[in-house]
Amino acid sequence: MTSQLIKKIVTGDEIRNAFLKFYSEKLHKIIPSASLIPDDPTVMLTIAGMLPFKPVFLGLKERPSKRATSSQKCIRTNDIENVGVTARHHTFFEMLGNFSFGDYFKREAIQWAWELVTNIYQLSVENIIVSVFHEDEESAKIWIDEIGIHPDRIVKLGEEDNFWSSGKTGPCGPCSELYYDFHPEKGLQNIDLEDGDRFIEFYNLVFMQYNRDQNGKLTDLKFKNIDTGMGLERMAQILQKKQNNYETDLIFPIIQKICEIANIDYFSSDDKNKISLKIIGDHTRAVIHLISDGVAASNLGRGYILRRLIRRMVRHGRLLGITNEFLPHIASVGINLMQNNYPDLKNNNDLILNEIKIEEIRFRETLERGEKLLDELISSGQKLISGFKAFELYDTYGFPLELTVEIAEENSISVDVKGFEEEMNAQKERAKAASSNIDLTLEGSLEREIDLFNKTVFNGYNSLLSEAEIKGIFLDSTLVKQASEGQKVLIVLDQTTFYGESGGQVGDIGTIFSKDVEVLVDNVMRKKNVFLHHGTIKKGILTIGQKVKTNVSSSNRAKAAANHTATHLLQSALKLIVNESVGQKGSLVAFNKLRFDFNSSNPISKDQISKIETLVNSWIMENHALEIKNMSKSEALEKGAVAMFGEKYDDEVRVVNVPGVSMELCGGTHVKTTSELGSFKIISEEGISAGVRRIEALSGQSALDYFSDRNALVNQLSDLLKANPNQLFERVNNLQSELINKNKEIQKMKDEIAYFKYSSIKSSAEIVNSFSILVNQIDGLDGNSLQSAALNLTSHLGNKAIVILGGIPNPENRKLLFVVSLGDDAVKIGLHAGKLINEIARICSGGGGGKPNFAQAGAKDIDKLSDAIDYAKNYLQKTLDSHSDK
């Protein structure tokens, strides 16, 4: 035995570490967990421990070693409705695995699995049942003859249960699974592995030995592989002797925090509350890892999954009686629980908590209104929620369809999912029609044709001029053999000095030329590592195979390079002055400006902006020489290089280093020294979405032009205000003070006019059934003055006052204003100022509203003013007469 038993393994961390240590001693290379965002475009999230190795199994990528072992974080949402309901369903889980790439096979896999579970984890043989594929006699023989398992402990299952395949064709093979028996006293007769209360499958050994062709025929693979998976949460349940995975030390500390916030006890809670506690506990782990791996909440793809999980957490928190914001507190526990094994959680702590906080606040703002509408639908007694209503809940209130279905099912109501999808498709069509100006020519046939070309070699970092050969010509998205003068084309070359749009940096411009041909290139795009040069043929005929030269505009390349380096300096300055957790959310590096999007819940103050500009400009003046090197991604990250949050990188990366200032993974073009930037100026800072801010800035000549324009503006203002530039602030400040004083004088005059006008009409109030009614026209008063007049009249007339004023503030504008003010007794008999004023204003093609005792409105038809006043008088007369009759 190569692993010496020191103590009984119990905790989740001990289980994980023991697994990796055991296989490391068996010469397996320990591979760190891959991101939840997979390289595989066929899946949205990393759903299995073997997924990062799929290219190796398929022969598409070199194996990292002959043997590997890992603890891989995974997310699955296909059974989300079972999370919290069953003992073992999760969205987030960790899969322990050992892998062989053409090295050892069944015998070693089975022997080592047995050694691990019996010697290291110390499981009793009496608690272990093994399943094998019913045609896999080889595995059964190893279990019985070499391991010594009694045949009664082996269950033979069919292809559906014990045969793994990657699809209808391709690598496949039989499985052997290890089950834990919680009730061995029931004996070995008539074993039913589907009995979830008795058995739990905890270790799956996949023997990848065949290739299945289109006819279903199996042939032996040249290299046979091993792919295994052990659920960490399941093994923790077994070794910690818990009723379910949720009560293990991997999840239960999170649940305890929820109980603390909700002021409830887990073990004495009813089943409904326990389900909510488990759902929040499970989703917490998924959410913190998704955000840490670069997923942001949205209505699409992974972002939608994240948003859905957070919104389920908020709702189940409300079911537990939690009415205040609580998710960041829960997430903090999850981060502390897992950060030792996943350091990225600690590094991204602030970012994770901020994203969760913003999303929770956003959903809480609409949840109450949405739940109210949903409750009305449920309480109406109907047994089906229409697709239209379900879509309204989604579109207006942010309710994911799944949440509506979940709440409806809890109340034995169905949802018209098909109708919802029809509404969703209709909206997409409307959006598509509204965005018909978007260029979609890069899709369709062009997308398919791109696969015909090899990767374009980029040789433009150190040279702007180079020779090349034309490999492809696209005319209107169609691949053609030649194109002539005047036509707009997309050109594919074997190599190019043109930078293709990537990493936020725009594509280069310039010319592609030969003795007989000239093409003005106005943009360069990348598609699947193929550079597409967009341009107009100014001279000659282009043909496939033609030898040409590429010549990039040096001035524009220099501008882009300066702005790209400035972007790196800006990010470093933001980290130092605003928050170390600032991370890039997007960028634009253009010729004339740069734009940088970053995470921040608060606006950047003017003082901070000034400090950022000063710091960046100091780095520019210090004339730092940039160092650019290629190295392995792991080496770069160890040296402290900053990677864009959520971005995918190759194993070898390009590192742009401004010594002592900035170090980033970047494929863009840059200056040689920071002094080439000249100067740096931030021209705007704004919020573009929840938790994301945007800075636009200038460098080089663009910054100088900006300063020149501002200087010209200052000179114009100096001439206008007859003051030198140094006196402008004082001059404008004095003008503002004068303006404020003049406005006060004007308002005083308006108030005096209003007082005079309302004084002249206050005696005209009529008494109807003890109420003082005053309905009158007062022209020449603005909204504030008219309101003041109405309130003063109401105060003068007392609790039984009913004041309605209408007037034309300015005859030239041909607009009307109305005000209704009611005393307390008028409100008590049922009059409502807001409703009354709306009826009055409607006569004059207007509208308004307000409180029961005071309201205001505007209208357009001044010719109907007298009709509106007559209506008000008649309405009040009838209403008060009716009240008198009562």
From Swiss-Prot:
<dbReference type="GO" id="GO:0005524">
    <property type="term" value="F:ATP binding"/>
</dbReference>
<keyword id="KW-0963">Cytoplasm</keyword>
<comment type="similarity">
    <text>Belongs to the class-II aminoacyl-tRNA synthetase family.</text>
</comment>
<dbReference type="GO" id="GO:0006419">
    <property type="term" value="P:alanyl-tRNA aminoacylation"/>
</dbReference>
<dbReference type="InterPro" id="IPR018164">
    <property type="entry name" value="Ala-tRNA-synth_IIc_N"/>
</dbReference>
<dbReference type="GO" id="GO:0005829">
    <property type="term" value="C:cytosol"/>
</dbReference>
<protein>
    <recommendedName>
        <fullName>Alanine--tRNA ligase</fullName>
        <ecNumber>6.1.1.7</ecNumber>
    </recommendedName>
</protein>
<dbReference type="Pfam" id="PF01411">
    <property type="entry name" value="tRNA-synt_2c"/>
</dbReference>
<keyword id="KW-0067">ATP-binding</keyword>
<keyword id="KW-0648">Protein biosynthesis</keyword>
<keyword id="KW-0030">Aminoacyl-tRNA synthetase</keyword>
<dbReference type="InterPro" id="IPR018162">
    <property type="entry name" value="Ala-tRNA-ligase_IIc_anticod-bd"/>
</dbReference>
<dbReference type="Pfam" id="PF07973">
    <property type="entry name" value="tRNA_SAD"/>
</dbReference>
<keyword id="KW-0820">tRNA-binding</keyword>
<dbReference type="InterPro" id="IPR018163">
    <property type="entry name" value="Thr/Ala-tRNA-synth_IIc_edit"/>
</dbReference>
<feature type="binding site">
    <location>
        <position position="670"/>
    </location>
    <ligand>
        <name>Zn(2+)</name>
    </ligand>
</feature>
<feature type="binding site">
    <location>
        <position position="564"/>
    </location>
    <ligand>
        <name>Zn(2+)</name>
    </ligand>
</feature>
<dbReference type="GO" id="GO:0008270">
    <property type="term" value="F:zinc ion binding"/>
</dbReference>
<keyword id="KW-0547">Nucleotide-binding</keyword>
<dbReference type="InterPro" id="IPR018165">
    <property type="entry name" value="Ala-tRNA-synth_IIc_core"/>
</dbReference>
<comment type="function">
    <text>Catalyzes the attachment of alanine to tRNA(Ala) in a two-step reaction: alanine is first activated by ATP to form Ala-AMP and then transferred to the acceptor end of tRNA(Ala). Also edits incorrectly charged Ser-tRNA(Ala) and Gly-tRNA(Ala) via its editing domain.</text>
</comment>
<dbReference type="InterPro" id="IPR009000">
    <property type="entry name" value="Transl_B-barrel_sf"/>
</dbReference>
<dbReference type="GO" id="GO:0000049">
    <property type="term" value="F:tRNA binding"/>
</dbReference>
<keyword id="KW-0436">Ligase</keyword>
<dbReference type="InterPro" id="IPR002318">
    <property type="entry name" value="Ala-tRNA-lgiase_IIc"/>
</dbReference>
<dbReference type="GO" id="GO:0002161">
    <property type="term" value="F:aminoacyl-tRNA deacylase activity"/>
</dbReference>
<keyword id="KW-0862">Zinc</keyword>
<keyword id="KW-0694">RNA-binding</keyword>
<feature type="binding site">
    <location>
        <position position="666"/>
    </location>
    <ligand>
        <name>Zn(2+)</name>
    </ligand>
</feature>
<keyword id="KW-0479">Metal-binding</keyword>
<dbReference type="InterPro" id="IPR023033">
    <property type="entry name" value="Ala_tRNA_ligase_euk/bac"/>
</dbReference>
<dbReference type="InterPro" id="IPR003156">
    <property type="entry name" value="DHHA1_dom"/>
</dbReference>
<dbReference type="Pfam" id="PF02272">
    <property type="entry name" value="DHHA1"/>
</dbReference>
<dbReference type="InterPro" id="IPR045864">
    <property type="entry name" value="aa-tRNA-synth_II/BPL/LPL"/>
</dbReference>
<feature type="binding site">
    <location>
        <position position="568"/>
    </location>
    <ligand>
        <name>Zn(2+)</name>
    </ligand>
</feature>
<dbReference type="InterPro" id="IPR012947">
    <property type="entry name" value="tRNA_SAD"/>
</dbReference>
<dbReference type="InterPro" id="IPR050058">
    <property type="entry name" value="Ala-tRNA_ligase"/>
</dbReference>
<dbReference type="GO" id="GO:0004813">
    <property type="term" value="F:alanine-tRNA ligase activity"/>
</dbReference>
